[in-house]
Amino acid sequence: MSAHEDLVGRIQAHLRGRGELTEGRVLDGDGYFLDGRLVVAVMGSDLCIEIGKDQWDDTLASEGVTPFLFAELPVPGWVMIDGGSLSSDESLSHWIETSLARR
């Protein structure tokens, strides 16, 4: 199983039963939506989430976190979490819950 497939399975398990879970393409990744709203996107083995502009600078100081880039420019309020930082269910849960708090 690839790192991408493993991450997708863990995300699905975490979100299952919390609303209507749907999947769809988002830019270069696979988006996971609850009740029609994007929660996370998986791009390769990395995770993309919205954390909000108010938390952006503080979140970027976290290990394994970089700005999400669109057309080579950072998108304020959106971050990428390196797949290596998501090896534990606890770390993945933290980032999913951070994204859900923005809903």
Segments from the language model and where they lie:
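Charge-dense, helix-prone N-terminal extensions
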Residues: 1-103
